[in-house]
């Protein structure tokens, strides 16, 4: 398990590709990206960035993204995600998978040119209390310090089960996973829906996802305990939280080897994340555009 804790930059770059997709194994069955059997290799050159919500941590730039995919019967490996699909049919499949957790990625170091630090904005209350009620909306006061002195967050691995159902041009999926690396013993699940549009060589994919993360997982990455308080941060105990995502992808197929690809993803973090003094922004926008070459 220490291999994941000291994960190389190359493996993290591979994981960046996986972080753009809405579900753990949904990308492994998209005919626009992958083959059904054998080895599929590729690389895309372009520009983009993965938004980083952590205080004083830069957005992660994306330039050259490799693609490594292996399919052998019911087993597959795609962009650091391993899957076994023992149950499948013409329009459904059930898979067991193992993948890296994206939250640990926000705390790792990268050698690429860093983007500007994101700026947080206040979140006003939805409705004021009625006059004379004596009830006040609690105000979360974040005290921040030196982010370099907080305790180390390691990149964890999650394993679970996912079910996918395809209906006409729609794909619906649900997954639930638990941690393997024993860092936070957290749980994570999600529901997602995607709609595919095909126009000759043009492909458009629209998706929406709701993720649920357990209190243990949120507290491990975004909680503030003794060491964080010593570094100047206010205390915070993580609680179960949600991530809400919208995603749009566009591809243009020049031929079997060359494609233009683009992805944009908006993600909203619930108050369980936003109230943490380690979180700088709860509205995240990630994107990438470039040319992909399939070997």
Where are the language model's segments positioned?
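Outer-membrane pore/translocation modules
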Residues: 81-190, 198-201, 205-207, 217-238
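Predominantly the C-terminal beta-signal and adjacent terminal strand-loop region
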Residues: 251-295
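Cleavable N-terminal export/targeting peptides
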Residues: 1-37
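Short glycine/proline- and aromatic-enriched beta-strand/turn motifs that initiate or cap beta-hairpins
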Residues: 27-78, 82, 104
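Outer-membrane beta-barrel proteins
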Residues: 29-33, 51-53, 72-87, 167-169, ...
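Outer-envelope beta-barrel architecture signal
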Residues: 35-41, 62-64, 75, 88-94, ...
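Residues on the lipid-exposed face of transmembrane beta-strands in outer-membrane beta-barrel proteins
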Residues: 45-47, 66-72, 83-86, 159-165, ...
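Transmembrane beta-strands of outer-membrane beta-barrel pores
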Residues: 47-53, 72-74, 98-104, 167-169, ...
């Amino acid at each position: 398990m220490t291999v994941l804790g000291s994960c190389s930059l190359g493996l993290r770059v591979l994981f960046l590709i996986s972080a753009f997709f809405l579900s753990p194994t949904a990308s492994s069955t998209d005919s626009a990206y992958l083959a059904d059997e054998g080895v599929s290799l590729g690389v895309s050159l372009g520009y983009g960035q993965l938004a980083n919500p952590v205080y004083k941590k830069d957005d992660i730039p994306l330039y050259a993204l490799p693609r490594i995919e292996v399919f052998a019967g019911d087993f597959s490996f795609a962009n650091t995600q391993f899957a076994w699909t023992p149950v499948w049919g013409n329009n459904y499949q059930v898979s067991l998978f193992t993948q890296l957790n994206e939250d640990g990625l926000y705390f790792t170091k990268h050698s690429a040119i860093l983007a500007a630090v994101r700026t947080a904005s206040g979140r006003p209350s939805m409705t004021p209390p009625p006059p004379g009620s004596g009830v006040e909306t609690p105000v979360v006061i974040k005290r921040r310090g030196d982010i370099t002195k907080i305790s180390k967050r390691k990149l964890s691995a999650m394993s679970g089960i996912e079910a996918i159902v395809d209906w006409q041009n729609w794909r619906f999926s649900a997954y639930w996973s638990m941690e393997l690396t024993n860092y936070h013993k957290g749980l994570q699940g999600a529901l997602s829906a995607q709609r595919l549009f095909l126009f000759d060589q043009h492909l458009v994919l629209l998706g929406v996802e709701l993720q649920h993360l357990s209190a243990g997982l949120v507290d491990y990455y975004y909680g503030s305990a003794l060491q964080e308080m010593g570094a100047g941060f206010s205390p915070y105990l993580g609680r179960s939280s949600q991530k809400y995502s919208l995603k749009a992808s566009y591809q243009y197929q020049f031929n079997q080897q060359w494609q233009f690809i683009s992805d944009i993803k908006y993600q909203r973090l619930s108050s369980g994340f936003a109230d943490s003094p380690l979180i700088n922004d709860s509205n995240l926008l990630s994107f990438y555009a470039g040319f992909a070459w399939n070997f």
